[in-house]
A protein has these predicted regions:
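Intrinsically disordered, low-complexity
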Residues: 3-216
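Active-site nucleophilic cysteine motif
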Residues: 225-230
Length: 230
């Protein structure tokens, strides 16, 4: 992709995070704060949204990869961003990643009531009433699925390059503090039997595929410039 070519120095810069650590860590903290607010709402949904007889929850896990977030922001801002510049981006990404919906359904139910007639005799009747059910659904679209929808092809190239190298900052988001952060991965190589390579078409296909060994997985990517999703 665009960020992967050029001189060694240019290539290194093009695959590196160039923003200040304080801005990158600040953006991550701001996004995590939005997630914490969402989690608080879900944890206290019944008290924050009272008035229903029953609450039913279908909730995806709230999580994201900080390297994906930083790579998206870097690609959106030509490699360098400040925390102040990305506040709108963080809100936009959060709104696209997390879709919280509430739907209300009603059922007619019956409760038994005891009544007394004019002669003092008691009897029971089944009285209908409306039972309100609040269905709460949270979908985590996955932050890594968003780039294909919000980045240009050129920006996708830079995003893929950042994800391939983790911005040359594998120390920025250590797993101990950021359990969902990506970690550096070495390509897995498969030893192809020599007899299989006697097939010229197969050999040509393998030769072409080997050009892209090590390219990162990018959801929706379909070319060398955007990386690939399969």
């Amino acid at each position: 992709c665009t960020a992967m070519f050029g001189s060694t120095g240019t290539g290194l810069a093009a695959t590196s995070y160039l923003s200040e650590d304080s801005d990158m860590l600040g953006a991550e903290a701001a996004y995590a704060a939005l997630e914490a607010d969402l989690q608080h709402e879900l944890d206290n949904y019944e008290s924050l949204h009272p008035g229903y007889d029953e609450y039913r929850f279908d909730l995806d896990e709230i999580k994201h990869d900080p390297y994906v977030l930083t790579s998206i922001l870097s690609a959106l801002h030509n490699g360098v961003f400040t925390l102040g510049e990305v506040q709108g981006d963080l809100a936009m990404l959060f709104e696209k990643q997390y879709i919280l919906t509430q739907t209300i359904e009603t059922e007619t139910r019956y409760r038994t009531e005891t009544r007394t007639d004019s002669e003092g005799n008691t009897y029971t009747v089944e009285v209908p009433y409306t039972y309100y059910i609040c269905n709460v659904k949270l979908e985590n679209f996955d932050l890594s699925h968003l780039p294909i929808y919000i980045l240009t092809e050129e920006q996708m190239g830079f995003y893929a390059a950042y994800m391939q190298t983790l911005g040359n900052r594998p120390d920025l988001f250590p797993n101990g503090s950021y359990p969902h952060a990506s970690t550096p991965k070495e390509p897995t190589y498969y030893e192809i039997p020599p007899e299989a390579l006697k097939d010229e078409a197969f050999a040509a296909m393998i030769a072409e595929a080997e050009k892209y060994v090590g390219y990162p997985y990018v959801w929706g990517g379909s070319s060398p410039s955007t990386s690939f999703d399969c």
